[in-house]
C-alpha cells in the first residue's frame, strides 16, 4: 500500500525543543531522544474516509502539489470551490475541489488519503488556539503550562507529533512541563 511520508531530516530541531521541557520523571527526556534518534521517516497517511484531509493534489503526469493554505487553494481552484466553501476541510467537500498546477497547468484532484491520527493530534494547539486568526490569543495560551499523560506509547505518538509540529512551525516546545505516569488500570486489573 502506497503511503505518504515526511522526511525527518529536521529531527535536530525537534531534539532541541525536547530539552526545553521539564520532564517528570526526568528519564522521559532521554526516552524521547532515543525515539527521535532511532525513528524513520514519518508515515502521515491512512487509507480511510474520515480524517484530516491531506492537502496534496495529484496530476495525470503523476506529479503532485502540496497546497499551503485555504487562500492558496481558492486561488488554484478551477472546479468545486463553490461546493467546498463554507464546509469543513474534510471529505467529501474538499475532494470536490480540482486545482490547476501553478507550473504545469495540469488539472489535478486531491489524493484520497487522510492524515494519520497522530498527525492530526499534533496540530491540536494550532487548530484550537487560533494560530492563524488571532496571534494575541495564541501567544497568551501557547505553549501549554502542563501536560499529564500516560507514558507507554506516547513518546512515539502524541508527544512526538506535538513536538514535531511545534518544532517546524514555532521552533519552541508545545508545553513547558510534562508529567508522565504508568498505565492506569481498573481495580480488577483491566486496562
Show where each model-derived region lies.
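Structured secondary-structure scaffolds
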Residues: 1-191
Amino acid at each position: 500500500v502506497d503511503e505518504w511520508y515526511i522526511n525527518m531530516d529536521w529531527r535536530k530541531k525537534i531534539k532541541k525543543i525536547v530539552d526545553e521541557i521539564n520532564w517528570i520523571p526526568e528519564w522521559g527526556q532521554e526516552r524521547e531522544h532515543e525515539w527521535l534518534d532511532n525513528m524513520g521517516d514519518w508515515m502521515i497517511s491512512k487509507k480511510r474516509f474520515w480524517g484530516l484531509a491531506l492537502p496534496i493534489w495529484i496530476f495525470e503526469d503523476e506529479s503532485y502539489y502540496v497546497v499551503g493554505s485555504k487562500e492558496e487553494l481558492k486561488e488554484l481552484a478551477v472546479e468545486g470551490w463553490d461546493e467546498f466553501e463554507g464546509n469543513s476541510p474534510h471529505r467529501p467537500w474538499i475532494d470536490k475541489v480540482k486545482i490547476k498546477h501553478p507550473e504545469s497547468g495540469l488539472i489535478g484532484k486531491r489524493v484520497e488519503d487522510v492524515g494519520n491520527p497522530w498527525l492530526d493530534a499534533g496540530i491540536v494547539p494550532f487548530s484550537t488556539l487560533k494560530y492563524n486568526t488571532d496571534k494575541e490569543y495564541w501567544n497568551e495560551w501557547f505553549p501549554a503550562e502542563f501536560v499529564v499523560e500516560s507514558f507507554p506509547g506516547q513518546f512515539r505518538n502524541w508527544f512526538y507529533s506535538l513536538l514535531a509540529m511545534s518544532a517546524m512551525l514555532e521552533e519552541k516546545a508545545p508545553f513547558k512541563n510534562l508529567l508522565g505516569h504508568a498505565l492506569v488500570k481498573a481495580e480488577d486489573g483491566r486496562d
